[in-house]
Amino acid sequence: MGVIIGHASLSENKTVNGSKGDQTGREVCTRNWYKYGGKSWSCVIRFRDPEMADKVARCVEMACRNDLIGYSQDTRNTLLKEARKYNYNVSKVTVPCNTDCSALVSVACMYAGIPESTLTLNGNCATTRTLQPILKSTGEVDIYTTPQYTANSDRLKRGDILLAVGHHVVTVLKTDGNPYRLMNNLLKEGSMGESVKFIQYELNRHGANLEVDGVFGKKTKLAVMLFQKENGLLVDGIVGTKTLTKLGAYK
């Protein structure tokens, strides 16, 4: 499948301004990775904490699925206004609103734990010109500018932010890799650690919306049971060899 990115793209008018909400289903959307301008991105911004990176990606995924969120630069901060009510969980937004590429990434970073006060100035979200220095100042990210990262998708990870300074910004949602290691082939409710993060990450790649916290709690068990049911497995909420195989753990 390759690398999939998510972004706020363009209004229903194929211009920078439009009505509130996604009128076409493609204003805030996913697509295959591409080189900006056919050449390269300016940089790749990567959170050092994989959990923060995953939350950035999940927020963008939720925005892509919520058709009440559209694209328009003149009302770019209305998503923030609505998402703020739900601790930046954009899946809970129920009022038509808009964002643009950098405002969406700003809200996603807030969902990951970066303070709103860091990412806004006088109520205005960071832009494609200010996003890089702002995130760098937090100490939470690494910045990559070599062609191996900016003009190639092989080294990208989920949650990476691809920035073309002054132009556009997108978020990596899906790659062919998992940032966590599987060190235990039998996991169940009560299990903890990196192996649990591995399966939570894989379940999210299959449509779940879990916190990647390394704790196999009730929500993770329910997600496992739903996955097992959808894939014709014994529905017991226990992750063993058969469930791991269906999850793609042994690719």
Regions found by a protein language model. Name each.
Residues 1-120, 165-168, 176-182:
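N-terminal capping segments
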Residues 150, 155-156:
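Short, well-ordered loop/turn sites that connect or cap secondary structure elements
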